[in-house]
């Protein structure tokens, strides 16, 4: 008998084989959902809706520090995208360059 697990991932080329069934998880009957990062992160951190999910690393670190985390982090980076299109500093900081 296979273990039923809910799996939430983004719709990336690196998850597509799992989503369309070309790749199986041994011993698992996955209920796979493709969601936007915003919806995944909100539902995971607010309600722990998924057995397996992508998480915001920063939000995970904060929840871990606060003792409120419900997930165990694995070092798997699916999106491979730099999430910060811009970073702002106050003029009073004295920082002039990156």
Where are these regions (language model features)?
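Extreme N-terminus of proteins, especially the signal/transit-peptide cleavage junction
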Residues: 1-3
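Short, glycine-/small- and polar/acidic-enriched structural segments
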Residues: 6, 13-98
């Amino acid at each position: 008998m296979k273990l039923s697990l809910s799996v939430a991932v983004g719709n990336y080329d690196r998850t597509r084989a799992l989503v369309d069934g070309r790749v199986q998880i041994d011993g698992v009957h996955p209920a796979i959902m493709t969601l936007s990062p915003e919806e995944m992160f909100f539902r995971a951190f607010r309600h722990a809706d998924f057995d397996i999910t992508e998480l915001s690393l920063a939000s995970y670190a904060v929840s871990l520090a606060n003792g409120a985390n419900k997930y165990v982090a694995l070092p798997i980076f699916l999106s491979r995208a730099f999430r910060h299109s811009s970073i702002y500093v106050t003029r009073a900081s004295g920082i002039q360059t990156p």
